[in-house]
Amino acid sequence: PRLFALHHSATQYFSAAALPSPIPNPDIPDNQLFISNKWHDAVSKKTFPTVSPATGEVIGHVAEGDWADVDLAAKAARAAFRLGSPWRWMDALKRGWLLNHLADLVERDCVYLASLESLDNGKPFQESYVLDLDEVIKVYRYFAGWADKWHGKTIPMDGEHFCFTRHEPVGVCCQIIPWNFPLVMQSWKLALALAMGNTVVTKVAEQTPFSALYLASLIKEVGLPPGLVNIVTGYGPTAGAAIAHHMDIGKVAFTGSTKVGHLIQKAAGNSSLKRVTLELGGKSLSIVLADADMDHAVEQRQEALFFNMGQCCCPGSWTFIEESIYDEFLERTVEKAKQRRVGNPFDLDTQQGPQVDRERFERILGYIQLGQKEGAKLLCGGEHFRQQCFFIKPTVFGGVQDDMRIAREEIFGPVQPLFKFKKIEEVIERADNTRYGLAAAVFTQDLDKAMYFTQALQTGTVWVNTYNVVTCHTPLGGFKEPGNGRELGEDGLKAYTEVKTVTIKVPQKNS
């Protein structure tokens, strides 16, 4: 999700002159597994290539971890969590201090980290630097402040008893990180787990491993105890599946596809009934009423869909427009999409980079062809842009019907279908007729209508006259298939602790 209010786009928020120069060819960090504060080859000695989505060229090769490596990482994390270990003895205030120190080091190296993200992921450098790295720093600092403020309570009981609760860490927490926001999504999970006193095994996406591996070197520089954070690179069906099935792991947090989320939930149930937090995305929606500020709504919808090349968990891929303004909204949307600058991620004027890899690139082009076959009208874009790499021009479809596959299925790319509606009751019924429910937005100047939508829409988040405003302070999660649990905010911490009830018999109790 976009990490600040979209009434300013990134290019408006910071001019190119205000940005530091990116590093187009950053040095590649250690390409091994990080276990117990040491670098290791995979047990199998296998490696796999990482490809630049902007050029199609191999950036480097990374250790291919699998079950044996996950087992070593889990054992290291379990040892770091043992009773009496330095981590278990550490004051909560000190845990917070270490997280703040990690934020300091990320801030020190933010240009390099942003350059790694753009090289590995293909996103424009200005977004990696202005949005992603800024959010990463804020997340570590925010949850550093929670480390010594999450506590239990005393509970009045009948009889001669004194009762209190303790909030204890779950233990070994595993985190499966997606490729669309590698550092951001890692911080969303790692900061909370460490603030609450857990130890961690992280499996990073095979498409985007390098920023996480560099963060491992910063974790070591901070002085976190060995085994506290372990990072495994590898593929989902091997390393990811090993995490989901491992008996010594107490919690899994996963951000990714609905299909894989189902597999992880099933594996957790078939193994140790470990806790599972799933943020699975899907299709999110926006509803634009006739009284909305047209310029603002068009701008918000463009950024909500095309930001990060459409590779977001809640990209606003359904846009319902009231019939009386549909034609004008369509015209302005197409005009703005044609103006969007697609190109080299390291060009500071670039607004859209390539898709992350060939598989996703070809999948998106397949949906564009499918939309045309189903009868939707291609109004702009839909083309491969540049050879030997994975650019797709911003694409807008009109005349889309609710039963078309481009309407029902997650595309995860720069494809914007537009729908029209006549009545509020009608659009609410259509909007809720889906298995997804992560986020929604409504654009209107009528507060009564806005409040009605916030109550009626079956989504975990509803924005009014804005989109993708996600910060470390507020919880994020979905209804229905987008998953369970919440990330971020105070609510996000609940998944990382167990509540223990302690009851003591006392000889005399007085109020």
From Swiss-Prot:
Pathway named in the protein's UniProt entry: Alcohol metabolism; ethanol degradation; acetate from ethanol: step 2/2
Enzyme class (EC, first level): oxidoreductase
Keyword Mitochondrion: yes
EC number: 1.2.1.3
Subcellular location per the Swiss-Prot or TrEMBL entry: Mitochondrion matrix
Active-site residues, as the UniProt record annotates them: 279, 313
N6-acetyllysine modified-residue sites: 45-46, 377, 393, 420, 423
A GO molecular function held by the record: aldehyde dehydrogenase (NAD+) activity
Catalysed reactions, semicolon-separated: an aldehyde + NAD(+) + H2O = a carboxylate + NADH + 2 H(+)
Family to which this protein belongs: Belongs to the aldehyde dehydrogenase family.
Name of the protein in question: Aldehyde dehydrogenase X, mitochondrial
Gene name of the encoded protein: ALDH1B1
